[in-house]
Amino acid sequence: MSDWLSLAKSNDPHIVVLTMDVHLSYFRDEYNFEEALRLLPFEWQCRVIQKRAHKDKVTALCNRLLQLYGCRLELNTQAIDFTQGKYGKPFVKNTESFNFSMTNGENFVSIIMANLFQTEVGIDLASINDFTSEGDLKIYEDVLSTEEYEKINNQTNLLDMKRLFAFYWSVKECYTKYLGVGLNGDLKIINVSLFSAPLINEAVSTFKLKDITFHSRWVSDNEILTYCFPAQYDFLKPIHAILNVVSVIEGIKTQFLT
């Protein structure tokens, strides 16, 4: 059994992060899509099929599959009562020792899960393709500090601007998800300008802000993942695993077979 799977099933304090590919080619087969969709609760199925674009449907489906798979592993039960906070952050009712956060990216979805008493966590995926030209910098001026704006503006080429912006954005959204407010929060309240984006081939970059530990890493050349948790739990050393959608689907099917 892999380290992350053993940890997720254990009762010991831990933090596990799972990232899953959004396998568009697999879901071009209508049978594969419908089979995976039927694994979800009916209410979730309705939310998935309400999406207009096929890619958005697939992303929503993958998000829910990963949420179901991860939370069932952690809580060792099929009977999970999910609900949402005021600003839409999902959580599990009637549990104080488990929390999680979800994010959708361009080609991936991710979840961070913490088996810790009354502990918030946050996570976000950001793509360099969200920043298409140097002119975009002006559009995002309201969410960047003066120092962040200048650092991006001073990059020597567009690709470096895109990567730095994606890094800043992922940290900011991760933090607001940690707070449970998402995009309803003020993205300027956290200033990331003192930190550099991790290198593409770097395993993980770790830094602290506001007594919170952040981990950032590129999951592809285009997408960066950032997740966070209270700095007091640094000793836990979170485990991050990248899964494929087929293994998650099979995992859901067989989770509680005897």
Swiss-Prot record:
Coiled coil residues, start to end: none
SUPFAM superfamilies reported in the protein's UniProt record: 4'-phosphopantetheinyl transferase
Class of the enzyme per the UniProt entry, highest EC level: transferase
GO molecular function: holo-[acyl-carrier-protein] synthase activity; magnesium ion binding
Transferase listed as a keyword: yes
InterPro entries, per database record: 4-PPantetheinyl_Trfase_dom, 4-PPantetheinyl_Trfase_dom_sf, P-Pant_transferase_sf
Family matches, as Pfam families: ACPS (PF01648)
Function: Catalyzes the transfer of a 4'-phosphopantetheine moiety from coenzyme A to a serine residue of acceptor proteins, such as alpha-aminoadipate reductase. Necessary for alpha-aminoadipate reductase activity.
EC number of this enzyme: 2.7.8.7
Gene3D superfamilies per UniProt: 4'-phosphopantetheinyl transferase domain (3.90.470.20)
Known catalytic reactions: apo-[ACP] + CoA = holo-[ACP] + adenosine 3',5'-bisphosphate + H(+)
GO biological process: lysine biosynthetic process via aminoadipic acid
Family: Belongs to the P-Pant transferase superfamily. AcpS family.
Name this polypeptide is given: L-aminoadipate-semialdehyde dehydrogenase-phosphopantetheinyl transferase
GO-annotated cellular components: cytosol
UniProt key word Transferase: yes
Keyword list, A-Z: Transferase
